[in-house]
Structure formats: structure tokens, C-alpha cells
């Protein structure tokens, strides 16, 4: 995989301390970043303010269309 060909990154568990660092990294790299977390927190609100699209409902319709492109999107998740 070439990270330069990736357009968007979707995170499951975006509000975790390790995941949020990756969210910020990909935002810095200019990628479309979106994700899901169970509850809003000051950290997820900060990520939204920095440009991430985060939702708190388990609803596939809330995933941005750009993140549904299998060829140019990576999904990052944690078992935590």
C-alpha cells in the first residue's frame, strides 16, 4: 500500500488516545478523516474542530461517501 494514494481514513474508536494521535497525523497529511466513537468527549470535540468528521451513532449512513471508496480508503480499528 502506498499512503500517498490513500484519499481518506476512517477510524472505529476515534476518540482513544492512540487513535486520536493517528487521526491528527492523517489530518496533517491532508487526508479526509472520519470516524466513529461511542460517546462525545473533549478529545473528540477537539478532533472535530481540527477537521475530522466524527459521529457517535452506529449508523452506516453517517459514514462520509469519500470513506466508502474501497480503493482509496483505509479503515483503522482497535479491539480496545
Go through the PLM ranges and name each one.
Residues 1-80:
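N-terminal leader/targeting and accessory segments in enzymes
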